[in-house]
Amino acid sequence: MTFRACFMLLGGLLSALSRLPSLLALDSSPNSQIVAPCEIRIVDRQTGWPVPMIEVETTNQLKFVSDNAGRIALDAPELMGVATWLNVRGHGYSVPKDGFGYRGVRVVPEAGGKISIAVDRDQLAMRLGRLTGAGLFAESQKLGYELDWKESGVMGCDSVQNAMHLGKRFWAWGDTNLPNYPLGRFHMTGATTLHSDSLPVLPPVRVAYQYFREPDTRPSNLAEFPGDGPTWLSGLVSLPGHDGAYKLVASYSKIRPPMTEYERGLCVLSLIHI
């Protein structure tokens, strides 16, 4: 092979390589398009209200859980256009059994489609939704709804205390999980809400907490008292002092492993400094 022929061959290879990214980009249509999820809405058969925290499960154990708006984004491409059995379960809610005793429904999901599943309420209380934790509207947001909802930065938290104080509802939670590390907050976290926003009576639940936060925006500890172990608060109440000004007071406990209370007392929360 002459020098000229080798030079021309090398030039052809370089030209082909330079076009490779654009050739790969062309492969994105139409057979490699992203499959849109199918929207499943879980509703109370009697009221039509959305029902959060209902689990649907496929025959190969894919599980999806409805969010505060009762929505599920079923995003399994292999199920689109396929008759699919979904086991349906949720505390206090159910669907009728079939002849073999299975509680579920058969649906045909379609990309971008919508399916409604009605559940029967077996308990007295109607579930309104989760108040805390992450992803309250995660499924809805995957489907393009509730895009104005902002995450709190809290993954989950322990039992709640609350009290009315200076015209607002004050909330305090125990051990609180944060997204950045397995060890979160262990000296109570807290927030306030306007009284009118505190007790929603219609779903979906959207409580607008104003959390007490660190400068880096993570929820802060409310009651990091001296001594080993977590600090837990209970019995929150707003009381007038000698000067007539109301103070937020509580009982506190200090806890050592495994779960030993070694100190108990009363405290006044100075919310100005939190």
What do the predicted segments below correspond to?
Residues L26-S32, G101-L124:
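Extracellular beta-sheet/turn segments enriched in Thr/Pro/Gly and aliphatic residues
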Residues A118-N177, G184-H187, T192, D197-F225, ...:
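N-terminal regions that are enriched for targeting/export leaders
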Residues I272-I274:
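Conserved small/polar residues in nucleotide/adenosyl-binding loops
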Residues L23-C38, R45:
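Beta-strand-rich domain onsets/edges
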Residues V160-P182, W232-P257, E263:
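Hydrophobic core segments of beta-strands in well-ordered, beta-rich domains
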Residues V35-C38, Q46-N60:
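Short, ordered, surface-exposed loop/turn motifs in non-cytosolic proteins
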Residues L79-V107:
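A short, solvent-exposed loop/turn motif at the edges and junctions
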Residues N60-A76:
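Short, acidic Ser/Thr/Gly-rich low-complexity loop/linker segments typical of extracellular
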